[in-house]
Amino acid sequence: MNIGLIGSGGREHALCEKILESRLVKKIFCFPGNAGTAEIAQNINADISNFKNILKLVRLYNINLVIIGPEEPLVKGLVDYLTKNKIKVFGPNKFASQLEGSKAFMKKLCLKHNIPTAKFKICSNKNQVLNFLNYSFSPYVIKADGLAAGKGVTICKTKKQVLKISQEIFKGKFKSSNKVVLEEFLNGEEASYFLVVDKKNFKFFGSAQDHKRVGEGDVGPNTGGMGAYS
């Protein structure tokens, strides 16, 4: 079968290589792909935010299954759009994508279902931030609510820094965020666990640790990811 792979990062290159191991796969079309995917698949220059054009290309190249890598098209509802048009697609729908697309949504979900999570406060103005700071201790964790290309989390040592960063977010530093989530700081190592789920079943896909700081030795601001191991 023909596979359509949405995305242009290293993640999509890795997915492309793995998908090609299947005997069921005839060809992979990457939208838009990158230099790595160009060596093992066919890159299609396409704007992945243009859902109508993606649908047109999927039909043009007789693609049997679409796999979506990046968070943004998931959060904006590409799965819902393709599914509505009878295209088979792998990825969470718009509602489920809020787990990644909104930290506030995720924290509320944890609270509702008694899932352990750091203490937090969702803030949309300076006064709410100040109120949180009056009852918390350094270091402080501040997170932009929406997608921020992996750069939306900062660990602050001072209240002044928290106020500065929160105001930048309120003023539109990250276009998808107009709220911040303030959290208590938890000391330890971070890890990600991956599962594929449907309405009745789940399958564990393994775990990994992502290293996001820009500098050697885990220093500097966060990035979308400097490397990971599993």
What role is predicted for each listed range?
Residues C156-S230:
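Internal nucleotide-binding/catalytic subdomain
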